[in-house]
């Protein structure tokens, strides 16, 4: 008999004794025979199994309170849980006889395909070359095609920064041109030689004519030419230019020399455009881009200039210089068009129209007899409201400005003399805007687009497969895009796909302009014969733009028929 110790509780058991009792209970429960499954399952569960409903595994009888045989205890079933509410997993094994058949693929396995079918508005400037989006190889569904099938692409006036062509046939013919082929391509470009390739080339690698034409289609003209600086794009290029050598940034004399040479080149380009010896050219500044087009292109009988994006300050400066312009994407409202038609309306006329609109807006208050109770906004408030509306569209596609006819010459002088054309601080300080042209001009330097054939991985049903691809990088202008597609149509037997990466501020150049009369295309082509473009390219650029504020982003050619998305 244990001695009575003060403060000792008789019900207290030492740890070894507790462990011994637990082992004894586990052995006694394991010895008891578990009842059959049919008896332990509730009637509702048996009915659900017969109906083929997915059920959770029913816990064993000995699972409550601990596992049998000293093993881990089974999870207790929630008595309030529904029998059919568990999430369905793709790799889950079948639970009942009704699920023995193999199931269809789980819907979320195709989510990547669905996302790819919705072409994104914006693409990264550069992606990994070894991974091509699957969308460039899928066929277009009917609602996604913006127009009927066509043998030609719509005209696209945006500048592309990168093209990625893919095909089932190799592009090895585009690599390692011979010295004679490279020289012949340069001569063909300088002499504007018209080359017509056959519909299909059996062996592109042995076709010297194809390789020379490919070299010809990669040439463009640039000013200024500074090989250590990326001169396109200029908008948002400060980070790429940071740390680069720029001796003119703090040298006013050198800046003056650069701007003088740039003014001569700019004037030379405009004179070529006016005489229809140059079809178009671009002026790329650090804030906006200007597209000058010759008369006859884009359905216009006059020289046109599009500026995008613009700000209220730039538009006010153009008004002060007497430049008549309009905002094509701003619709008419009330008595006047909400455009900045510089000198079409004088200040007095605009003020009179504004006062008339204000009187009409408050006329209904007088009819109700409450005009004295409503505080009429003063002229200053109305002016501030209008200025806020103008500022809100700054740097947006809606701020694109259109200049026509003789006003383009006034715009030329305005840009040459404008102090805000060149950055005064930052990596681009003192650097003149970039001039891009498809033909030679005074002070221009011949440049080449970079081309290389690579292999890309595309997702297939059995994993990944190799696809032949051709990558083009650089400032790809509209004539180069059309020339390359014509060339690849012959070399790839009328079948390829392409992903296009546009310079976003230039996508708005595809807007349709309101024309005064319909042009005779035969006369237009005859007048622009010496502009240096292939007749087929000239015919395409003469068409009225149809893409609006968007640009081509994906193109698929199958059996010489184009489908595209913008």
Swiss-Prot record:
<comment type="similarity">
    <text>Belongs to the DONSON family.</text>
</comment>
<dbReference type="GO" id="GO:0006260">
    <property type="term" value="P:DNA replication"/>
</dbReference>
<keyword id="KW-0597">Phosphoprotein</keyword>
<keyword id="KW-0217">Developmental protein</keyword>
<keyword id="KW-0242">Dwarfism</keyword>
<dbReference type="GO" id="GO:0007095">
    <property type="term" value="P:mitotic G2 DNA damage checkpoint signaling"/>
</dbReference>
<keyword id="KW-0539">Nucleus</keyword>
<feature type="modified residue" description="Phosphoserine">
    <location>
        <position position="34"/>
    </location>
</feature>
<protein>
    <recommendedName>
        <fullName>Protein downstream neighbor of Son</fullName>
    </recommendedName>
</protein>
<dbReference type="InterPro" id="IPR024861">
    <property type="entry name" value="Donson"/>
</dbReference>
<feature type="modified residue" description="Phosphoserine">
    <location>
        <position position="28"/>
    </location>
</feature>
<dbReference type="GO" id="GO:0033314">
    <property type="term" value="P:mitotic DNA replication checkpoint signaling"/>
</dbReference>
<dbReference type="GO" id="GO:0005657">
    <property type="term" value="C:replication fork"/>
</dbReference>
<feature type="compositionally biased region" description="Low complexity">
    <location>
        <begin position="73"/>
        <end position="82"/>
    </location>
</feature>
<feature type="region of interest" description="Disordered">
    <location>
        <begin position="1"/>
        <end position="110"/>
    </location>
</feature>
<comment type="function">
    <text>Replisome component that maintains genome stability by protecting stalled or damaged replication forks. After the induction of replication stress, required for the stabilization of stalled replication forks, the efficient activation of the intra-S-phase and G/2M cell-cycle checkpoints and the maintenance of genome stability.</text>
</comment>
<dbReference type="GO" id="GO:0033260">
    <property type="term" value="P:nuclear DNA replication"/>
</dbReference>
<keyword id="KW-0225">Disease variant</keyword>
<comment type="subunit">
    <text>Component of the replisome complex composed of at least DONSON, MCM2, MCM7, PCNA and TICRR; interaction at least with PCNA occurs during DNA replication.</text>
</comment>
<dbReference type="GO" id="GO:0031297">
    <property type="term" value="P:replication fork processing"/>
</dbReference>
<dbReference type="GO" id="GO:0030894">
    <property type="term" value="C:replisome"/>
</dbReference>
<dbReference type="GO" id="GO:0005634">
    <property type="term" value="C:nucleus"/>
</dbReference>
<feature type="compositionally biased region" description="Gly residues">
    <location>
        <begin position="62"/>
        <end position="72"/>
    </location>
</feature>
<dbReference type="GO" id="GO:0000077">
    <property type="term" value="P:DNA damage checkpoint signaling"/>
</dbReference>
